[in-house]
Amino acid sequence: MGVGKRIYRGEARKMILVRNIRLELGDSADALRDKAASELGIAPREIKELKIKKRSLDARKKSDIHWLYSVSVSVRNEEKTLKRAKSRNVCEYEEFEYQIPQIKSAERPVVIGFGPAGMFAALVLSRAGLRPIVIERGCDVDTRMERVEAFRSGGELDPECNVQFGEGGAGTFSDGKLNTGIKDKRISWMLEQFHRHGAPEEILYDGKPHIGTDILTGIVRSIRGEIISLGGEIRFNSKLTGIKTEGGAVTGIEVTGKNGAYALPCRCLILAIGHSARDTFEMLNGLGVPMEPKAFSMGVRIEHKQADIDLAQYGAVYPSLPAADYSLTQESDTEFTLKTVNNDQWSCLTKKVN
């Protein structure tokens, strides 16, 4: 297996997209299929498959709060149905499906870091039959939870196992919010893997997908279990300390683990080291690896009573609605931007780095 070789392939499945389907707060689940069929000009029974692609809450008018859905549907004759549909909310749609082929190779790829990037890299490699080895400087999520709680209770900081380092990455303790782009076709696949391992179905279509730390730790544990069941290996409390090269190509790495330092041969190396492994950055910089600074945020947490935010956003308290949120952004002529961030209500000064 050569470095950089794509180990997945995908194919587009033709479906129909129906957008801007309005549901009232008290509508039943069957109403979505009925209204999608109405937009298409067909009977509900003619829809073979319906998948929610996006759901958002329109609360701009507090007297008229409602849900807006986009769904993909499969019918017996898509082309005929599209021609017959008169609604502007109906269009042709391609559902992208990934297929991970099996690859035969005696070489085992090495992944450094077991945060989101490293975890999904190892998951795909495992499903391809490549039995990756993961090197993670922190500890497993259960031990990590104990160390974090001990620190928050006034205990001692473990520099290698804390809210920044360990299985699941820094986001494991940030309430499980999922930040993704909107254009990459791989996003839906990744959300599907979270759902497959225990995340609620709503993350597949909500505009601001959210899991929660209490659920996320179990998901992380489940993904690790699948990787191991497919022949992968996760080495916790193990730190990358050096990279060996020959002729401009990686030939191996140096690792310091619980039982001391050792060398590990490898020709395929994935660095998923996150944003806080500064000693690793220094080592990579010494090897001449190109890198550049990234903008960062710093700030304080603003706490409100959830009932006050619900009242301000919805005009009343609706038990059937999710917790309301808000965001504010203030641009300035300086190099800083002030903004709040989703439900956590973090007020951040973001510095622009040239």
Predicted regions and their residues:
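Residues forming the flavin
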Residues: 4, 12-67, 71-354
